[in-house]
């Protein structure tokens, strides 16, 4: 799975990237602001974005809403030590993970997203097969 990380603290972003790699996933980029997260998402189209809530130029929830406005299928997990619950709930993020983040919790979240991606891909393949057969029969 291809993952984009957005955290304004470089050391946290690097640590998070190392944890994601440890779980056998690919890092497409590590950026330091909500604005950079939007730009990087548009460029890389990752399978998942792990995004800090508190960042300069645009907080994580606002960046999340911006990404989802352009790509409703985007999968974004907010990561934060503390964030206003109203803002995070309305962000569209699929999950909110508390900092400090432990490897077990991160791995479980990554596995959930990877399984969701597999199920979605299988459903698309099945639907394509049904449509193809219907066209051949029709």
What would you call each of these model-derived segments?
Residues 6-7, 31, 49:
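Conserved sequence signature across two-component system core domains
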Residues 10-29:
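Two-component/phosphorelay signaling modules centered on CheY-like receiver
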Residues 30, 56-57:
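The feature encodes the CheY-like receiver
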Residues 33-36, 59-62:
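Acidic catalytic/metal-coordinating carboxylates
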Residues 52:
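Active-site residues of response regulator receiver
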Residues 60, 89-97:
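As written
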Residues 101-112, 122-126:
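C-terminal output helix
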